[in-house]
Every structure is written in structure tokens, then in C-alpha cells.
């Protein structure tokens, strides 16, 4: 089980939002590159970056912080980025700068042709982020709820050739209420590409529950508020996941 620390970037700072609300941001660090180094030292094997400003305006906004993170740890572990990625030039630029994966969210829903082109041009580097409330996909920084079912879109994107799906339960994100295991497993069982869980991770019991369904196609989990608030010790969580994987 891949535990992936999230570094959410707003105005060049590392923050956490509550349920995607830009007005409810808690600043955890003014040095995102140092935060990236911290998580690598704690045993992280991949990092998940979100350009929050970029997600809302539809173009990259925290370039300086993102490039600093890539320079700090990008040659040691894969780094993935979502937020404000709406065209092929942006993808190419970020991959050239050293990102391993780009995450397409809103643009995948609104412009499937773009996603298809991205998978053709940059196969192996494209992840789709699907954010949902009650099984329905949301877009535009969670501000708009669509009529699309998560599973329907995910299967379509699998056909396009995406590398993985990050599934976020909006209702649980930043609330420390536990991962929506049932919905995540149901999605993973409906496709052959990996699903990465997101939204609500709160304690070691969640890690236990996730590891129990790893064989169903749930490859990893995004670790957000819990590892910043102290509710979850990241190093201990990764150690537990490794122990469970090895059957000890």
C-alpha cells in the first residue's frame, strides 16, 4: 500500500483546506520544499502536490513552489501534481520539469478529447482525479456537481489509457471521518487500473482497512490533514502498511 503525503499549495504556502473551501485554509508550512524533504525522510515513496490556486483559475499558479519541491526530492521519489492542468503544453512543461505524473480532474470531465490526447501523447504519466459526492462527480474545485456517475467515467478513462484513478470522497475530505472504503473498493473492482483512495484518512485503523482491500485494486491512499494535525504518524502508518503487506 502506497501512502502518499499531500502537499496542497496556496499562495506559495503548504496548507490544508476543509472540504475544498479556500476560505478555510490552515497554513502548515511556508517552505513547501522543506515539507517535501520532511515526508521523504519519514519514508514517503511518492508525493501528491495540488496547485489550489491553479485549480480555481484553470492554469498553473504555484510554479515556484512546485519547482522547488521537484528540485528537492524529484530525483529520489515520483512526484505527481494536480490543479490547473487544462492543456497539453502545460503537461509537457511539467513533465520536462521533472514531474512523474500529472493529474487531470475537471478538464477530464469537461473535455474528454483533451484527456484522450494527453494519454496518447504522454502515456504512462496521466492520472485522473475524480472527486465525488454520493457517487456523483464534482468539478471546478468541487464547486459544481455533475450528473455523471464515478464508475461510468472511470471506465471510460481506463479505455483512454490513464495510469490510475484518484478517487476522492468530497464529503469526508479534511474531516478525519475515515476513508469511504466501500465506495473505493466498488470502483476498484469495476476496472483493471489502480485506484488511489483520498478523503478522510484519519488513523491506523484506516490503514488496516485499506491494506485489507489492496488485492481488490486499491493501490494507495493520499494522506492529508491527519498527518499534519498529528492524528496519524506517517512513518508509523507506512511501517504498518509494509508489515501487513508482508503478512507479518
From Swiss-Prot:
Name of the gene encoding the protein in the UniProt record: hisA
GO biological process: L-histidine biosynthetic process; L-tryptophan biosynthetic process
Catalytic function, reaction form: 1-(5-phospho-beta-D-ribosyl)-5-[(5-phospho-beta-D-ribosylamino)methylideneamino]imidazole-4-carboxamide = 5-[(5-phospho-1-deoxy-D-ribulos-1-ylimino)methylamino]-1-(5-phospho-beta-D-ribosyl)imidazole-4-carboxamide
E.C. no: 5.3.1.16
Pathway: Amino-acid biosynthesis; L-histidine biosynthesis; L-histidine from 5-phospho-alpha-D-ribose 1-diphosphate: step 4/9
Record protein name field: 1-(5-phosphoribosyl)-5-[(5-phosphoribosylamino)methylideneamino] imidazole-4-carboxamide isomerase
A GO cellular component annotation in the UniProt record: cytoplasm
Annotated catalytic residues: 8, 131
Organism: Cupriavidus necator (strain ATCC 17699 / DSM 428 / KCTC 22496 / NCIMB 10442 / H16 / Stanier 337) (Ralstonia eutropha)
Gene Ontology MF, one: 1-(5-phosphoribosyl)-5-[(5-phosphoribosylamino)methylideneamino]imidazole-4-carboxamide isomerase activity
Localization terms from the record: Cytoplasm
Record-stated family: Belongs to the HisA/HisF family.
Keywords: Amino-acid biosynthesis, Cytoplasm, Histidine biosynthesis, Isomerase
InterPro entries tied to this protein: Aldolase_TIM, His_biosynth, HisA_bact_arch, Isoase_HisA-like, Isoase_HisA-like_bact, RibuloseP-bd_barrel
NCBIfam families on file: 1-(5-phosphoribosyl)-5-[(5-phosphoribosylamino)methylideneamino]imidazole-4-carboxamide isomerase, PRK13585.1
Pfam family, one: His_biosynth
